[in-house]
C-alpha cells in the first residue's frame, strides 16, 4: 500500500475531495493510505500559533518551521529518519512552491512508483525557507500562478499519481491513450451523440467503422 501524508494548516480543504473518486477508490481498495496532518496540532503555544511575520518586512504571515518540523518528527520518528526520507529513492518529502519545477505527466509516473510521499502545503505568504533547505526532497509547482495555499495543488498532483495505479481506475489501459501518456502530445478531439449539434457534425471518419482510418485521424489530430 502506498502512503501519502498531507501536512497543512487547513486540512478541512481535503475532507470533501477525499470522499470522491479516485481518492475514495484508492482508499477503499487499500491501494493508498492518505493521512491528513494538521499543523494546528503542532502549534508552538496554547494560542495555536503556527506562523509569524516575515523578517525584513512584507505583507502577510509565514508558516514557522517548528510546527512543520514537529509534524515530520511525528511521522518519521527521528531527525535521522527525516533525512533518510529526504534522500531516499523510494520516498519523498515535497514542498508545494510556485517557484518550483512544473509538474507534468512524467513526474506523475515517477511519483506513482514511490512508496511514500509527504506533501507540505504552504499557506498565507509561504513557508520559512529553512523547511525547504533542511527537509524537502524537492519542490513542485503546478505552474506560473499563485494560489492561497498548497492544498489544492497537492490534491491535483495526488490525483494524477493515484489514477496511474491499476487498482484505482476501472479501465487502467485508458491511461495509455490519454494526453501526455507516451509523448508530449495531447489527445485528439472527442465526440459523442448526437451526430449533429447546432449545425456542427461529428467527423465522418469516426462514423465510418474503418479502424485504420480512424486511427490515422486520431493520430493526425493529436496536438
Model segments located where?
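Structured adenosyl-cofactor binding patch, chiefly the S-adenosyl-L-methionine
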Residues: 131-170, 180
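S-adenosyl-L-methionine/SAH cofactor-binding core of RNA-modifying enzymes
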Residues: 62-121
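N-terminal nucleotide/polyanion-binding subdomain common to many enzyme families
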Residues: 1-76, 212-214, 219-221
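Hydrophobic/aromatic beta-strand patches that form the interior of the parallel beta-sheet core
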Residues: 5-7, 35-37, 94, 117-118, ...
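A short acidic, often aromatic-flanked loop/helix-cap motif at beta-alpha or helix-coil junctions
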Residues: 40-45, 101, 146-149
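SAM-dependent methyltransferases
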Residues: 1, 83, 190-223
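Internal, active-site/partner-interface "lid" segment
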Residues: 152, 164-204
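Short, solvent-exposed amphipathic alpha-helical segments in soluble enzyme
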Residues: 21-25, 109-113, 134-135
Amino acid at each position: 500500500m502506498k502512503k501519502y501524508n498531507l501536512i497543512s494548516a487547513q486540512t478541512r480543504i481535503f475532507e470533501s475531495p477525499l470522499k470522491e473518486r479516485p481518492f475514495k477508490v484508492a482508499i477503499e481498495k487499500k491501494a493508498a493510505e492518505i493521512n491528513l496532518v494538521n499543523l494546528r496540532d503542532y502549534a508552538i503555544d496554547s494560542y495555536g500559533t503556527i506562523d509569524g511575520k516575515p523578517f525584513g518586512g512584507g505583507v502577510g504571515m509565514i508558516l514557522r518551521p517548528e510546527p512543520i518540523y514537529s509534524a515530520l518528527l511525528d511521522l518519521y520518528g527521528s531527525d535521522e529518519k527525516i533525512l533518510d526520507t529526504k534522500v531516499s529513492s523510494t520516498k519523498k518529502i515535497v514542498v508545494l512552491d510556485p517557484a518550483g519545477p512544473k509538474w507534468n505527466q512524467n513526474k506523475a509516473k515517477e511519483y506513482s512508483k514511490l512508496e511514500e510521499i509527504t506533501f507540505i502545503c504552504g499557506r498565507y505568504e509561504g513557508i520559512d525557507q529553512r523547511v525547504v533547505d533542511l527537509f524537502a526532497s524537492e519542490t513542485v509547482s503546478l505552474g506560473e500562478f499563485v494560489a492561497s495555499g498548497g492544498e489544492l495543488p497537492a490534491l491535483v498532483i495526488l490525483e494524477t499519481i493515484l489514477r496511474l495505479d491499476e487498482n484505482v481506475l476501472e479501465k487502467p489501459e485508458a491511461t495509455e491513450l490519454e494526453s501526455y501518456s507516451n509523448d508530449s502530445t495531447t489527445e485528439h478531439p472527442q465526440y459523442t451523440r448526437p451526430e449533429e449539434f447546432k449545425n456542427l457534425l461529428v467527423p465522418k471518419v469516426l462514423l465510418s467503422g474503418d479502424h485504420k482510418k480512424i486511427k490515422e485521424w486520431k493520430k493526425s489530430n493529436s496536438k
